[in-house]
Amino acid sequence: MQTVFSFLLAALLHEGGHYAAWLFGGGKKNNGGASFRFGYAGAELRVPPSGSYRAALAVQLAGPAANLLTALVTLFFPGDFPRLLREQSLLLGGLQMLPIRGLDGGGALEATAALLWGERAAYRLPAVTSWLCLTALWLLSCCLLLLGSGNLSFFVLSFWLLCRQVRR
């Protein structure tokens, strides 16, 4: 039960980081667009576009930053729950920073590419990095399964993310 609760708390803190950055960047709580939900893929916060690539970049990076901050704070607390929360936070924040469309890293890459090279690069670069990362993750999960040292959940996650990319 502690594992489930620690993951839910890590996800809430992650999404809270996004929300705080959105509010700090000028977003309004009641502007008719911010919504939070738990879905089959985890927690999701939807906020209206800010109109600024810098603000979008800050919002994208704020979730993983909240996970990193959570992990650092839990270093000072003994026990199983802080350790679980630290591990879950680092896992969630690290996974979200992969440069894959639909994850925070993909959104951050898109905003950065738009700032540096324009709209065309903002569309193309995340598409390429998504395919490269997802293919590498899926191949790694297949190899680990075949060698007997992998786990099925990593294979399912990488396959699910790859299928999501195919649908885009």
Regions from the PLM with identified roles:
Residues G17-G26, T70, T74, A111-A113:
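Active-site-flanking alpha-helical
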Residues A34-F36, M97-L116:
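Juxtamembrane/interfacial segments flanking transmembrane helices
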Residues T3-A11, R83-G94, L147-C163:
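Hydrophobic core segments of alpha-helical transmembrane domains in multi-pass membrane proteins
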Residues Q2-A56, E87-Q88, L98:
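Small-residue-rich helix-interface/hinge motifs
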Residues M1, V73-G79, L139-L147:
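Hydrophobic alpha-helical transmembrane segments
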Residues A62-V73, T129-L139:
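Core segments of transmembrane alpha-helices
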Residues L9, H14, G63, Q96, ...:
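Divalent metal-coordination and catalytic microenvironments
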Residues T112-R168:
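C-terminal transmembrane module of polytopic alpha-helical membrane proteins
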